[in-house]
Amino acid sequence: ASDVYKRQLLKRPALNTESLFDTVRSIIDKVRAEGDKAVLEYEATFDKVTLSSLAVTPEEIRVAETLVSDKLKAAISLAKQNIETFHSAQRFVGKKVETMNGVTCWQKAVGIEKVGLYIPGGTAPLFSTVLMLAVPAKIAGCKEIILCTPPDKEGNIHPAILFAAQLAGVSKIFKAGGVQAIAAMAYGTESVPKVYKIFGPGNQYVTAAKQLVSLRDVAIDMPAGPSEVEVLADASANPAFVAADLLSQAEHGVDSQAMLITTSEKLQTEVMAEVERQLAELPRREIASRSLENSKLILVRNIDEALELTNAYAPEHLIVETENYMEVAERVTNAGSVFLGALTPESAGDYASGTNHTLPTNGYAKAYSGVSLDSFIRKITFQEILPEGIKTIGPAIEEMAANEHLDAHKNAVTIRLKAINK
């Protein structure tokens, strides 16, 4: 197949945030100018809720805890523990390196002091995302972890979101959604502290808002688009499992994309039948069936061709259900998170295995990693130069600076060499 055809085949549904920029910019500007007042007004307009204040009270958190079932509390606690275990293993230990005699360099990892987490409202309460963002932030040593999430029409936040936030160590929770929440965290209001970096998924308005505030005022985790999965399978795959994986992606939202790349025509046919059968039983079948319109089933000649397409597509989630899946996995170079073998559904990583589910979409997996402990830290470099060190590297610095016509740079070394050579 030609490269042009392959590109067409892997084309994603277009996400156009440009057209939203004017609307989004005007909301950001108003929040920046008017603070809480503007946020409360937008909550009334967009979330149809009249709030007297934005902050969630300790009493609300206490009540929420009583409303979450013991079974769900136990599940959330198990997930938290696994996310903690996996992200703690990512801790950076910087060792001192003597690059030359008398020249020592090292790095120190420091948590970003203030981070803002955005948890969307929408059609599902994403308490799992609270864990995915707050747990690594806590391990990283972020001093202030604030969370914004839209309330329902009664002004309440889903109890599981409050429970997960409390469990994971969030410092402050605010009732604010959409663009107004992103603006509040980017610029600060009377209630909401200004943060240094904003994390979390959202619709195209939230994505556009994150893009705009990141241009000059605050860092963001990564550009985000609709969620996506690719299943790479051969004849050994279980068609019911593959169909279940495609549907679990499709129920996220109407713009989600699910794709099957397989070497087996028989599997392709069986998966199509299974998708129909399972879809009929899903409560969110309306959303899932609309999202399946963006989906593709691609038949390839061999695993090499499957991998070529996979690495060109760079899926957010990649499920490898083949006979020798470890060998296939070794050859994956572009993907957000990879799920190996018949018993590893994407849902495991979405919730409780320990890996992070905040991942690059829209082909960004070619250049971006998913959220990890590193997302919440900065590495500061240090260096110390002793007399024998400046004597050794000084002449090289002088020579380089002179050739770049930066005489003051050269002089900063010369003046020191003179002083120690007296």
Segment roles from a protein language model:
Residues 1-5:
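Short, small-residue-biased leader/transition segments that mark boundaries at the very start
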Residues 14-63:
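Long amphipathic alpha-helical segments
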Residues 49-126:
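N-terminal Rossmann NAD(P)-binding subdomain characteristic of aldehyde/semialdehyde dehydrogenases
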Residues 97-163:
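Conserved small-residue-rich beta-alpha loop and adjacent elements
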Residues 169-257:
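Conserved NAD(P)+-binding/catalytic subdomain of aldehyde/semialdehyde dehydrogenases
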Residues 252, 260-335:
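A glycine- and small/hydrophobic-rich beta-loop-beta segment
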Residues 312-422:
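C-terminal core of ALDH-fold dehydrogenases
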